[in-house]
Amino acid sequence: MRLSDFDYELPEELVAQEPVTPRDASRLLVLPREGAAEHRAFTDLPDLLAPGDLLVFNDTKVIPARLVGTKPTGGKVELLLCEPLGGGLGSRWRAMGQASKPIREGTTLLFEGLEARVEASEGEGFYVVTLDREGEALEAALARAGRIPLPPYIRRAPSDVDRERYQTIWARAPGSAAAPTAGLHFTEAILARLAARGVERTAVTLHVGPGTFLPVRGDSVEGHRMHAEQYEVRPEAAAAIAACRARGSRVVAVGTTSVRTLESAWRGGAVAAGAGRTALFVRPGHAFRAVDALVTNFHLPRSTLLMLVCAFGGTHRVLAAYRDAVARRYRFFSYGDAMLLARAD
């Protein structure tokens, strides 16, 4: 497969720069297994799912992970906390650092009262750092000193609005440097309607790292390597998925991160409870085992996220739907509109 196989033309003005208000006021492109696409509102989602279907959310919480501070010399430094090492909101992190000169091991960086000691350089701008606090104290320090790490295609400074809107309403586990954006459309009213219809829900956790935005280098898709991310499937989620399968209902993943979590946790014919790290690269040819339908946003041309969606819905059908969405002026990427896809195979 060539990278160019996953390209499409997108006018810059269709890249959503602000969230819609309210959250569920977005559009929904429905791509069934067969037949023409439908153009609906996201508020129609409960009517498009069946009683007994199971929605699987990612309950990770975006942290204000972008820090701007100084080195002991007074020079400016930026740090993006990418992945907690050891689980939870601990003190050791993998981070991306940017300064006028390479940051030396042993250097202590200062961020409005929060200190980070550089323990090791991993190359390509990545470092292992130890912060001077953890848990609730760290969460409070990041709320004060950190900024929400908006994606690079949102060409404005983060605002206080983003602290609320670049976060799902069910976010529970702090640790992500990017939001699981398919979940941003859901409101309490939508969840109540889903419950009234008999649609069930559960949650898994995958802490999204900045690798989600890194481009595929070269034109050969097979040579790309994903950055590993931490995930967890709790026993109650595994049990809910098994019960859904047993009654013949659909597992509906909310977002590509939920797909990667469930496919990574597949063991011996079922989704297994447990925690680990996954670098699973889902692309056309992947045999999906855990997921029947997918709610997702529109993704960047040539991105690994688009490749996952093409693998799930069929490359030709998905790219045709994207071209249709462009023609109909859908809004794209993190703050954009959504799709509901049935699995192609």
UniProtKB/Swiss-Prot annotation:
Its localization reads: Cytoplasm
Q: What class of enzyme is it?
A: transferase
InterPro entries, from UniProt?
QueA, QueA_dom1, QueA_dom2, QueA_sf
Quote the pathway field: tRNA modification; tRNA-queuosine biosynthesis
Q: What would be an example GO MF term here? A: S-adenosylmethionine:tRNA ribosyltransferase-isomerase activity
Instruction: Provide a GO biological process annotation.
Output: tRNA wobble guanine modification
UniProt keyword Transferase, yes or no: yes
Q: Which reaction does it catalyse?
A: 7-aminomethyl-7-carbaguanosine(34) in tRNA + S-adenosyl-L-methionine = epoxyqueuosine(34) in tRNA + adenine + L-methionine + 2 H(+)
**EC code:** 2.4.99.17
Q: Which UniProt keywords apply?
A: Cytoplasm, Queuosine biosynthesis, S-adenosyl-L-methionine, Transferase
Q: In terms of one coarse class, where is the protein primarily found?
A: cytoplasm
Q: Which Pfam families match?
A: Queuosine_synth
- Family, per entry: Belongs to the QueA family.
Q: What does this protein do?
A: Transfers and isomerizes the ribose moiety from AdoMet to the 7-aminomethyl group of 7-deazaguanine (preQ1-tRNA) to give epoxyqueuosine (oQ-tRNA).
Q: This chain belongs to which protein, by name?
A: S-adenosylmethionine:tRNA ribosyltransferase-isomerase
Natural source organism: Anaeromyxobacter sp. (strain Fw109-5)
| Name of encoding gene | queA
